[in-house]
Amino acid sequence: MNQHQATPGTLPSDEASRHFTPLIQPDLAGLYSRRAARLRALAEGHDLADYLRLAARVAEVQASLVAEADVSGPADARAIPQEGHWGALLDRLIERLAHDVPAPVAPHLAALRALPADARLGAAQALTEGRFDAVPAAIAPFLWAALSLQCASAARAAPVPDSGPAEHASCPVCGTAPVASLILIGDRQGMRYLHCALCESQWHMVRAKCTNCGEASELDYLSFDTAEATVRAESCGVCHGYLKVISLERDPPAEAVADDLASLALDDAVTAEGYQRTGFNPFALPG
């Protein structure tokens, strides 16, 4: 694994003074479709090819369900389970996946379909409260996919929150941790945005400082490739946390959830160095 320290050049010289949008909410159907395409591309020759393709299929179904989501509910993570709208999305998700998943996955979808309403609610509450180990790993990603679609849809229908000048370690819309941070291209060339694991919002944070504690004095960037790798782990020697940085400058088709999921081996290596991940992936929930 390669390691290099942050330098002043890592931070674009004009980022602090440039006009920028503090919060971005990408079009959901387009986002899910791009994610699915990226997952399928990354699956080629990958050790986790079957799982990456399953995640791609889930993203495709999410894209097909965007128009069916109820946008009237709250976008707060802990309020979503009680609203109940996500349950109908879960049923449709299971129905559309049932005949198009690997054989070992089918029994888990059937068990999830048969789960009583109170058990579903309890599992959803556990996930949105961060008690991931309370939900079987075989069904958690499907539950999360429905919860995420509902929360993301509600977030796009609600007024954009005024998060103030402070930069946030967690999503200013729903309060959930990020999947990773993205270095963007185009009008926001070189700017960093964190991508929410639940509502799919993206919020700005300047580069070359820890996304968890805000310190800039002890940052290292770890990767299996060179310092110019598309996916690197930004690790902090102050709080001992880390979060991946995914550069669209280096690979424009890169996508937060897809590229993070395809680089879980990097998580294992960074964790072995004594760092703790400060975010999570919807298809690889902690616990």
UniProtKB/Swiss-Prot annotation:
One MF term in the entry's GO annotations: ferric iron binding
A Gene Ontology BP annotation from the UniProt entry: protein maturation
Cystine pairs: none
InterPro entries per UniProt: FdhE-like_sf, FdhE_C, FdhE_central, FdhE_N, Formate_DH_accessory
Highest taxon listed in the record's lineage: Bacteria
Record function comment: Necessary for formate dehydrogenase activity.
Protein name: Protein FdhE homolog
Organism of provenance: Cupriavidus necator (strain ATCC 17699 / DSM 428 / KCTC 22496 / NCIMB 10442 / H16 / Stanier 337) (Ralstonia eutropha)
Gene symbol of the encoding locus: fdhE
